[in-house]
Each structure stands twice: as C-alpha cells, then as structure tokens.
C-alpha cells in the first residue's frame, strides 16, 4: 500500500515550487521558502529532489512530455488516419485533400486539437511562465523550449508521419514558422494570460475564445490555398 502522506507531501512540494518559481524565478527562490510554502521540512524536499534545479527540470520535462503526447494523439488519430483512408496526402510539399468534405473534417478536427492544446497550456500557464522566464536567461532551459519542435532524426512526430508518407525532413523555413508562429504565440498567450486579463478586463472565456478565433482564421486561410504551409517547406529526401 502506498504511503499517501508522502505522495501528498511531494505534490505539495511541486505545487509550492510552481507558485514560487513563477513569481520569483528559480534562482531567487530558496529551498527553505519552498519548504515553508509546502509545509514540509527541507530534508523531505531533498528526499525527493537533489536540488531546486531538479524540481525545475521535473516541471519542465513533464510539461513537454504532456504537450508532445497531445500532438502525437492528433497525428495518429486524425493526420495519419486520413492519409490511410485516402482522404489526404502529401504531394510536392503540400497537403492535398480528396474533396471538400475532407477539408472540412480536417479543419474541424484541427480546431478541436487547437482548443485541447490551448486548454492544456492555460491549465499549466504557471509552469509555462517559469519556462519562459528561465529560457530568457540563456541556460539549458532555453534549449528545452526549442525542444518543443522535436525536429531531430529520432523525433516521434517525424517517425509517425514517415510511416504513411515516406521519409522527409523539415526545412529551415518550416522550423522558423513552427517556432515563431505556432509555438511562441501559444506559449506567450499562456505566460501573459493573467497579466493581459488584468489590463483588458476580459473574462477567461472571452480571452480564450478570441485566441481560438485568431488561430482558426490563420488555419482556414492556409487551407483555403490548398496548402498547409508545406509548399517549399517540407521536401521529400532524394
């Protein structure tokens, strides 16, 4: 039987760290402050984590793993399934659809995915704020932010798509677009959500709806060109 008191203590340590790191940053937060906030001893913190930096690593990696899982679900359940069913294919660096119904289904599914990813980001906005703060310092967590692209040879996203469309690679243009026009807007929206809400007086639902509409406008405009931002962006290897 698990010791629930210890599990609760670890969760309190993590939650206290999230609160303090998001307010002050990791460097400015002392271990004894985490202990006081969590209602535990410093010794218990060191029982679970070697240092406050290890707590930070745990928070960031858990966030990235969960985000990658959401992306992979969309790829497997929608992207790859449509390819297998012949409703969509990649041709000359573009997404081609079999008919208008396929386009509408893809857009509808993509919109649901965007909302799911947005809800995840907002639920974890304190951790995203921490990641943003730490990445600006130029330390290892800057590379963590770039890891969200997952563009290496062993990247699960690339492997998954390659199963249906053959081997291909991302060009520099697509990498830049994905980072600055896809990942960064979502990260920034989550990180500054509370600050913007304070000066705008918008409700949670109003801000969320406005962001979703903005993303949908961009997505719809790309699809209307019969291209999903892949023209001259993703090329088949020779």
PLM regions with names:
Residues 1-8, 19, 73-84, 230-238:
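N-terminal intrinsically disordered/low-complexity leader segments
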Residues 59-109:
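Amphipathic alpha-helical linker/stalk segments
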Residues 84, 119, 123, 155-167, ...:
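C-terminal peripheral helix-coil segments that are non-catalytic and often amphipathic
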Residues 12, 112, 130, 177-181:
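Amphipathic alpha-helical interaction segments
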Residues 12, 16-23, 70, 130, ...:
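Solvent-exposed, amphipathic alpha-helical segments
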Residues 12, 16, 20-66, 77:
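Helix-turn-helix
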Residues 62, 130-134, 181, 185:
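Short acidic/histidine-centered micro-motifs embedded in hydrophobic/aromatic stretches
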Residues 108, 112-166, 213, 217:
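Amphipathic alpha-helical packing segments from all-alpha helical-bundle domains
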